């Protein structure tokens, strides 16, 4: 066939409604808003082309490969209900386009340059179906939910955490003391804030030492295993690994990483180190809202959550449904299931566009954090279930009597909710009564109930289905 130079419409090559998807294809659902005058077939085909083999003009070297084997294909287009000129375009990518075990490479293709494409007004990646053949090239979470419970010897209830505040400005000694008070009071974990790395007021090594002391002292007093998420995030990968190694030498159970600001390559390396060395890995999602909060452009958090499960992390922040940070109930529970379960059915009412089989890749524990306090405990226990970490920062440290009583209040509230649930009571209907009953025999809980009885963060959720 002679080479024919010139520009041709994308849809002639990349829009293939007759295509039957393969079990090995990576499938993507994009929300596409074309520029006025651009037909949806052309827009969908352009997305498939620009995120796979295509470029803006026919090139001579196209003849040296098999486009049919390597091209992305837009195989289905649906109008978005209630929106004019907006479509869900489904694209199938052959597996050969992606390097094994690399979330970085997968994202560079699928959510790379195509998002700056001029023929589109906006583009959002709503969901990805990762084929089992590709899932199997990833280690995934260092340990997963069951192994974590076995390591910590904690079963049958959510775990409790607390982010140490003020997030910046404490000395290492005072920071360690705050950790100790929380852990002694009954929490399972305390947490470095995501922006605590190694600053002039508190260098990382000092913090690690004082927090390790807090862990060992509180473990000795309570007879429970305790942890503090030591943030290993750093300016270079070498420095990050140095911090992880030091944490392992201290014998602590868990470290933490900011996976979006730190990057997927660094995260995957750290996850491999954590599995090899018995460390749990807590993941913070700082920067996610830059990517996922706009409805029409960017990437939905469920995609970032899937990517994290592949790259590796044992915990990840996932919104609260009830606190100060974003999260609409059905949608949040949709990606919480994607993190924890082995098999998730397609369910558009929860924003899940594809059935996903994780073929026994370990699960990730979702972390509910942000503006939550004791009055939220029944709702959180009901919504998130046992396999979750409930994190109360201000909701622990803001207690009028101090950190340890704040921790006691949270632990009593949690134990009361778990017991009530196990006795068959309805947490949604009786939640406030359950907390009030428990506060009768816990002065710490009674004081917490009094402080936060009126606090609500009532705003309309941005992340709705449509």
UniProtKB/Swiss-Prot annotation:
It comes from the Eukaryota. Binds 1 Mg(2+) ion per subunit. The record marks 324 as: Transition state stabilizer. GO terms for cellular component: chloroplast. It catalyses: 2 (2R)-3-phosphoglycerate + 2 H(+) = D-ribulose 1,5-bisphosphate + CO2 + H2O; D-ribulose 1,5-bisphosphate + O2 = 2-phosphoglycolate + (2R)-3-phosphoglycerate + 2 H(+). InterPro entries: RuBisCO, RuBisCo_large_chain_AS, RuBisCO_lsu_C, RuBisCO_lsu_C_sf, RuBisCO_lsu_fd_N, RuBisCO_lsu_N_sf, RuBisCO_lsuI. The modification N6,N6,N6-trimethyllysine is found at residue 4. The disulfide bond which can form in the large chain dimeric partners within the hexadecamer appears to be associated with oxidative stress and protein turnover. Keywords: Calvin cycle, Carbon dioxide fixation, Chloroplast, Disulfide bond, Lyase, Magnesium, Metal-binding, Methylation, Monooxygenase, Oxidoreductase, Photorespiration, Photosynthesis, Plastid. Its cofactor is Mg(2+). GO terms for biological process: photorespiration; reductive pentose-phosphate cycle. It is found in: Plastid, Chloroplast. The active site is at 165 (proton acceptor), 284 (proton acceptor). CDD domains: RuBisCO_large_I. GO terms for molecular function: magnesium ion binding; monooxygenase activity; ribulose-bisphosphate carboxylase activity. Heterohexadecamer of 8 large chains and 8 small chains; disulfide-linked. The disulfide link is formed within the large subunit homodimers. Belongs to the RuBisCO large chain family. Type I subfamily. RuBisCO catalyzes two reactions: the carboxylation of D-ribulose 1,5-bisphosphate, the primary event in carbon dioxide fixation, as well as the oxidative fragmentation of the pentose substrate in the photorespiration process. Both reactions occur simultaneously and in competition at the same active site. HAMAP family: RuBisCO_L_type1. This is Ribulose bisphosphate carboxylase large chain. It comes from Barleria prionitis (Porcupine flower). The gene is rbcL.
């Amino acid at each position: 066939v002679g080479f024919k130079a010139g520009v041709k419409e994308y849809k002639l090559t990349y829009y293939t409604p007759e295509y039957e998807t393969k079990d090995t294809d990576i499938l993507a659902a994009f929300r596409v808003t074309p520029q006025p005058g651009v037909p949806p077939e052309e827009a969908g085909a352009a997305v498939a082309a620009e995120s796979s083999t295509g470029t803006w003009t026919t090139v001579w070297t196209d003849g040296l490969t098999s486009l049919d084997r390597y091209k992305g294909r837009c195989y289905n287009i649906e109008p978005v209900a209630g929106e004019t000129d907006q479509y869900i375009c489904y694209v199938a990518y052959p597996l050969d386009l992606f390097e094994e075990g690399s979330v970085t490479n997968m994202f560079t293709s699928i959510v790379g340059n195509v998002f700056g494409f001029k023929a589109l007004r906006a583009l959002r990646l709503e969901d990805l179906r990762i084929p089992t053949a590709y899932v199997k090239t990833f280690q995934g979470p260092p340990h997963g939910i069951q192994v974590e419970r076995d390591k910590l010897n904690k079963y049958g209830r959510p775990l409790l955490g607390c982010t140490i505040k003020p997030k910046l400005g404490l000395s290492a000694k005072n920071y360690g003391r705050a950790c100790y008070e929380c852990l002694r009071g009954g929490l399972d974990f305390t947490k470095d804030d995501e922006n605590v790395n190694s600053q002039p007021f508190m260098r990382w090594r000092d913090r690690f030492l004082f927090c390790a002391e807090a862990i060992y002292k509180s473990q000795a007093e309570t007879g429970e295993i305790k942890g503090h998420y030591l943030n290993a995030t750093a300016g270079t990968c070498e420095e990050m690994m140095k911090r992880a190694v030091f944490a392992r030498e201290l014998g602590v159970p868990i470290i933490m990483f900011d996976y979006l600001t730190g990057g997927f390559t660094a995260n995957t390396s750290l996850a491999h180190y954590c599995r090899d060395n018995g460390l749990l890995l807590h993941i913070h999602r700082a920067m996610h809202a830059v990517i996922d909060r706009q409805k029409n452009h960017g990437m939905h958090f469920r995609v970032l959550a899937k990517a994290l499960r592949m790259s590796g992390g044992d915990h990840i922040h996932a919104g609260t449904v009830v606190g100060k940070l974003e999260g609409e109930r059905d949608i949040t529970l949709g990606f919480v299931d994607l993190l924890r379960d082995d098999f998730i059915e397609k369910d558009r009412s929860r924003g899940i566009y594809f059935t996903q089989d994780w073929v026994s890749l370990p699960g990730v524990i979702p972390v509910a954090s942000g503006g939550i306090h004791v009055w939220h405990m029944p709702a959180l226990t009901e919504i998130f279930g046992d396999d979750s970490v409930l994190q109360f920062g201000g909701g622990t440290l803001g207690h009028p009597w101090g950190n340890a009583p704040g921790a006691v209040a949270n632990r009593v509230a949690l134990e009361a909710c778990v017991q009530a649930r196990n006795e068959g009571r309805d947490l949604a209907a009786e939640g406030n009564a359950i907390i009030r009953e428990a506060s009768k025999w816990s002065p710490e809980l009674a004081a917490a109930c009094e402080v936060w009885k009126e606090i609500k963060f009532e705003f309309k959720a941005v992340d709705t289905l449509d």
